[in-house]
Amino acid sequence: MLLSDRDIRAEITAGRLGVDPFDDSLVQPSSVDVRLDNLFRVFNNTRYTHIDPAQRQDDLTSLVEPKEGEPFVLHPGEFVLGATLERCTLPDDLAGRLEGKSSLGRLGLLTHSTAGFIDPGFSGHITLELSNVANLPITLWPGMKIGQLCLLRLTSPAEHPYGSSSVGSKYQGQRGPTPSRSYQNFVKND
């Protein structure tokens, strides 16, 4: 069941759902708008011949922070990682779905490639997978509305929420745009 604005406010007031910093004006009829943080991860495409999800490639991306009052310019065809300004904390009976803002989609900005789902129990800044599919550069301003977080109530609390030792949560507590840790999904045969 998708939470309404009144349910979202009630969950935040009760301290079960965390959206920090919280601004009540960002609550929409069935979502909470989230804003763009000021940190980005750009790909160093001259260091590798290819991306291998099975390999740890620590210098595949570099952290970039635009100067105060300046935007990050995302060029056509580019892909970077960003993050929400808000730290989001979900209880064990709520899951989240990050959606883009339609006004930005109409300009050619995609806010996530595949990872729009947030598990119950997650706590951290949500990493954004930003792509420009337009034919002109798009300026991304820290603090701008970048997406909307929809919240869904589970039929029962998760037995092993995200962050539990049994589920191998790789991104719990993340701050800023966090690079892929897909290599942790591969078993090493030494």
Swiss-Prot record:
Active-site residues (renumbered): 129 (proton donor/acceptor)
Biological processes, Gene Ontology terms: dUMP biosynthetic process; dUTP biosynthetic process; nucleobase-containing small molecule interconversion
Superkingdom of this protein's organism: Bacteria
Catalytic activity: dCTP + 2 H2O = dUMP + NH4(+) + diphosphate
Disordered: annotated span: 161-190
Function, in words: Bifunctional enzyme that catalyzes both the deamination of dCTP to dUTP and the hydrolysis of dUTP to dUMP without releasing the toxic dUTP intermediate.
Complex formation: Homotrimer.
Protein name: dCTP deaminase, dUMP-forming
The species this protein was found in: Mycolicibacterium vanbaalenii (strain DSM 7251 / JCM 13017 / BCRC 16820 / KCTC 9966 / NRRL B-24157 / PYR-1)
Organism ancestry: Bacteria, Bacillati, Actinomycetota, Actinomycetes, Mycobacteriales
Gene name of this polypeptide: dcd
